[in-house]
């Protein structure tokens, strides 16, 4: 049976695994489902059609599953889905999706999300990301696996942040950031490959060399995006990492940072 503090309010329809812990004064809504081993701190509010996986640590004053900050929202039963083994620190706010897009805001597994982070409606966050304090995603944004967003990074709506990206503090992201790239500034601009992060994650010397060549084609040779894509195609045929970059560029509807 779940451990629920006497001051917490848990709606009758909420579904809690047997070893879930709910802290003082927290509120758990009617359509919330919480998986095994998840702990919820004090004064947290989990509402809406929200599904939370296993072994998550949700700290004090977090708000999950509230209505999107979108004037078009009219009470539709859209969703928030959170995976397993995430750490969600104090005062984070994650909103449900909207019917104008995918209808769900989705966060993956093993993410480390620091205090005051905002993840807006219809965002998609992959696995093993790090969001430093006060990073914010506007609606419909996407963040790939292993990305690291520096403190106070702001991501414009519909922007995509690729896998293994790292942004500097207070970066303002108006366009898509390709995978493996470091970015910083207002607006964010490319500052080389995330070499140290890629080494720590076990990328081979061959893969790193291929990505360095790809970065040079994309950013150092004065190519247009179309020209860079054409030049990257032969490298992509030989290296999966370059193919991942090329696939991202094909989806970059807002253009990429330059």
Swiss-Prot record:
NCBIfam families from the UniProt entry: lipid_A_lpxA, PRK05289.1
Quaternary assembly: Homotrimer.
A GO CC term attached to the entry: membrane
A biological process from GO: lipid A biosynthetic process
Annotated family: Belongs to the transferase hexapeptide repeat family. LpxA subfamily.
PANTHER family xref list: ACYL-[ACYL-CARRIER-PROTEIN]--UDP-N-ACETYLGLUCOSAMINE O-ACYLTRANSFERASE, ACYL-[ACYL-CARRIER-PROTEIN]--UDP-N-ACETYLGLUCOSAMINE O-ACYLTRANSFERASE, MITOCHONDRIAL-RELATED
Catalytic activity: a (3R)-hydroxyacyl-[ACP] + UDP-N-acetyl-alpha-D-glucosamine = a UDP-3-O-[(3R)-3-hydroxyacyl]-N-acetyl-alpha-D-glucosamine + holo-[ACP]
InterPro entries, per database record: Acetyltransf_C, Acetyltransf_C_sf, Hexapep, Lipid_A_LpxA, Trimer_LpxA-like_sf
Protein name according to UniProt: Acyl-[acyl-carrier-protein]--UDP-N-acetylglucosamine O-acyltransferase
Annotated source species: Thiobacillus denitrificans (strain ATCC 25259 / T1)
């Amino acid at each position: 049976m779940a451990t629920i503090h006497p001051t917490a309010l848990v709606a009758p329809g909420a579904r809690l695994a047997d070893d879930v812990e709910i802290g003082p004064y927290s509120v758990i809504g009617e359509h919330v489902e919480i998986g095994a081993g998840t702990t919820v701190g004090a004064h947290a509010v989990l509402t809406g059609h929200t599904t939370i996986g296993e072994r998550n640590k949700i700290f004090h004053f977090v708000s999950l599953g509230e209505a999107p900050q979108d004037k078009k929202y009219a009470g539709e039963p859209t969703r928030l889905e959170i995976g397993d083994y995430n750490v969600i620190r104090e005062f984070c706010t994650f909103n449900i999706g909207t019917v104008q897009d995918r209808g769900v805001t989705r966060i993956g597994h093993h993410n480390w999300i620091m205090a005051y982070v905002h993840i807006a409606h219809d965002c998609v966050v992959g696995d093993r990301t790090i969001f430093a304090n006060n990073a914010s995603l506007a609606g419909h944004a996407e963040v790939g696996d292993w990305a690291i967003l520096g403190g106070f990074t702001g991501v414009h709506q519909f922007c995509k942040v690729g896998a293994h990206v790292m942004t500097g503090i207070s970066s303002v992201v108006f366009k898509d950031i390709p995978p493996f790239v470091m970015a910083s500034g207002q607006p964010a601009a490319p500052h080389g490959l995330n070499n140290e992060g890629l080494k720590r994650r076990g990328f081979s010397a061959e893969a790193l060399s291929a990505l360095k060549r790809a970065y040079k084609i994309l950013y150092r040779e004065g190519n247009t995006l179309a020209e860079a894509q054409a030049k990257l195609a032969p490298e992509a045929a030989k290296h999966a990492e370059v193919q991942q970059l090329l696939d991202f560029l094909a989806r970059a509807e807002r253009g990429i940072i330059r």
